[in-house]
Amino acid sequence: MKYPIGIQSFENIIEDGFVYVDKTDLVYSLATEGKVYFLSRPRKFGKSLLVSTLKCYFEGRKELFKGLAIDSLETDWYHYPVFHLSFGGQNFPEPYTLDKVLDEFVSEAESIYGKGPFAQTLSSRFKAVLGNAHKKTGKRAVVLIDEYDKPLLDVMDAEMTITTDYGKIGLEEYNRNLLKGFYSVFKEADADLRFVFLTGVTKFSQVSVFSGFNQPDDISLSPEYETLCGITEEEMLSVFAEPIEKMSKSYGCDYDGMVAMLKKQYDGYHFSKEMTEIYNPFSLLNALKKGDIQNYWFRTGTPTYLIRLMEHFSENLYELTGRYMPNRTSLTTKPTWSVLCR
C-alpha cells in the first residue's frame, strides 16, 4: 500500500496509485448545493488535497474519478475556468510580500484571459479577469483559495509598520485591508462566479477580511460535512485493515487492541454536534506506514503563530491539559508544547 504522505495533489495520488479515502460524494454535494463556502480545519488535515480534488472536478477531469463515488453522481463533467490560489508556500513577515503574491496570481490569470482596459488595482484587475474568463469560455469561474489566513497569521505579532497614503499602520492591518479588498471581488463579480471555496486553520471576525462580500457558508461545524477532511473509524477499518493487522503483530496485540491504541493516540477530533470521531490523517498514515505510534503531527503541524504567542506567557500545563507533567510545568518553550499535540 502506497501512503500519500506529504502529497497534496489529487491528480498525483490517483495517477501514481496512492491510497485514497474517497470523499468525492461530499465534493459533489459541495459543488451542486451551494456557491460560496468557508472551511476551517487544523493543519495537516487534508485541506489542500480537498482543494486539489475540487480543482480536478471543476476542470472536468472525469478520468481521475473513475470508480469513486462521484463517478456515478456526475453526468456532465463541464470544464470551468479555475483560479487556484494557495498562500501555503509563502512567508509573509516581510512588507509587501502579499502584494507581490497577489500581483503574480492576477498577472498569470491575465496572461490567459486578458486584462481589463481600465483595471488598475489588484481587486479591479481580478474582477476583470473573472469577467473575461466567463466571456471567453462561456462558463462562470471557480475560485479556490487555500490557507487564506496565512498572510495574517504570519504577522499576528509583528511590530513592523508600513507607511500608506493614510499614515502608518501595522503590517497585520495592512495585510488584512489588502485581503479585504481582494475578497470583495466575490461580491462585485457574483454574476461571473460559479463556485468559491476558502479554507484555512482559523476564522477571523465577521468584520475583518470577509466583510467586503456576502458572508460565505461556513461549513466548519456542519454535520453534513464534518467528515469532509480527516478519516473516520469506519473508513480506517475499511481501507486500512491489512496494515493495522500487520502493525498489531509488531506490537504483540490482537487487531482490536491495535485499533484501540490508534484510537487513543489519533482519534478524538469532532467537527459538529453529531460528535463523529475523526482521526488525524497525517498522523494515522505515518503510523501505519512506519508501524510505529508517535507524535507525527507535532513535528510539522504545530501552528507557529500559536507558539509565538504562547512564548509571551507562562501557562500551567496541568490547567491546559489535565495531565501531570513533572519538571515541565510551564509552557515557555517549543518542545513543551508537544504535550498538547497528538
What residue spans do the PLM features occupy?
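Phosphate-binding site recognition
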Residues: 1-342
